[in-house]
């Protein structure tokens, strides 16, 4: 078997593995990027070719999680704009900044994300309790923008007014916390994703897991969309502004498409604690590799 064929098979296999991991957690770049470096690709060329190759795989993973995306349109539109803007900025930074400029803070970002994921259940419960208490408070005790789901009033025969307030149900209407702060944090994760992207999914799940009282599977589905938007807009910048190795990108894409479907099937069957443990393990591996 020729060296070129072995190299092609290795890059395809790396794309398959990366697509699988990206659909479940993220950090597939930590497989494909080092593989390209091992075959002699220059770092920036390897990074941009890898980014473009992984875009179809992320799209495949999003399709696999389409059931979990139901009812999340507003969330995706709001945070998607942050991801697109961040990915655009990150891609431009990759092309104009020195290669090592951003690498210094990458381990810190991943470490913060891991801490958020470890303590996510406790923090999410605490923040949700505060939000629900505020929503259930009488109108005079809340701000003008406070909402009450199911509030209604009836007037009795004697002219007296009876007000009925039904507290929101967390399971049916997931509490959303963060507002502009969460938008900025997702934007910053997009900047990081457009620049390099390894463990971007860990960062996003850490942020959204604390901000939303929702299932890990639904949060993971949104994470796939956000990562896809970041990779997609960064890919457009790279295609327009720099050289791409389309052979490597094509091999990664072919493997990542298959991996995205496989990863979605695996990830959707994992219980919340299992998905969280897997995310933490991948994040630790990413941290060790980046610090090595």
Task: List where the protein language model places each region.
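Selective hydrophobic functional segments
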Residues: 48, 52-113, 231-273
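Residues within membrane-spanning alpha-helices of integral membrane proteins
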Residues: 8, 14, 51, 106-110, ...
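Residue-level signature of the transmembrane alpha-helical core
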Residues: 12, 16, 20, 51, ...
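Transmembrane helix-loop junction
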Residues: 38-39, 95, 104, 210, ...
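Transmembrane helix exit motif
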Residues: 59-70, 108-143, 161-171, 285-292
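Alpha-helical transmembrane segments of multipass membrane proteins
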Residues: 16-20, 35, 62, 88-92, ...
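Membrane-interface alpha-helices at helix entry/exit sites of multi-pass transporters
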Residues: 41-49, 73-78, 213-224
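Selected transmembrane alpha-helices and immediately adjacent juxtamembrane segments
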Residues: 1-42, 131-220, 250
């Amino acid at each position: 078997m020729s060296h070129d064929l072995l190299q092609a098979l290795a890059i395809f296999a790396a794309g398959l593995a990366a697509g699988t991991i990206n659909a479940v957690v993220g950090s597939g770049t930590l497989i494909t990027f080092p593989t390209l470096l091992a075959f002699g690709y220059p770092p920036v060329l390897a990074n941009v070719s890898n980014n473009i190759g992984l875009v179809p795989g992320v799209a495949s993973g999003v399709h696999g999680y389409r059931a979990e995306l139901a009812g999340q349109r507003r969330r995706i539109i709001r945070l998607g704009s942050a991801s697109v803007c961040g990915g655009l900025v990150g891609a431009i930074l990759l092309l104009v900044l020195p290669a090592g400029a951003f690498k210094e803070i990458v381990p810190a970002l991943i470490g913060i994300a891991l801490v958020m994921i470890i303590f996510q259940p406790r923090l999410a419960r605490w923040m949700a309790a505060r939000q629900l208490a505020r929503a259930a408070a009488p109108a005079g005790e809340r701000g003008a923008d406070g909402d009450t789901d199911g509030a209604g009033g009836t007037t009795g025969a004697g002219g007296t007014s009876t007000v009925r307030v039904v507290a929101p149900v967390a399971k049916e209407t997931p509490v959303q916390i963060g507002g502009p702060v969460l938008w900025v944090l997702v934007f910053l994760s997009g900047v990081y994703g457009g620049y390099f992207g390894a463990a971007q999914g860990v960062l996003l799940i850490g942020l959204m897991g604390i901000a939303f009282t929702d299932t890990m599977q639904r949060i993971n589905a949104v994470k796939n969309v956000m990562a896809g938007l970041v990779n997609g807009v960064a890919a457009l910048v790279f295609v327009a502004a720099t050289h791409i190795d389309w052979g490597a990108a094509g091999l990664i894409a072919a493997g990542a498409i298959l991996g995205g479907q496989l990863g979605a099937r695996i990830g959707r069957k994992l219980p919340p604690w299992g998905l969280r443990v897997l995310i933490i393990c991948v994040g630790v591996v990413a941290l060790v590799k980046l610090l090595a």
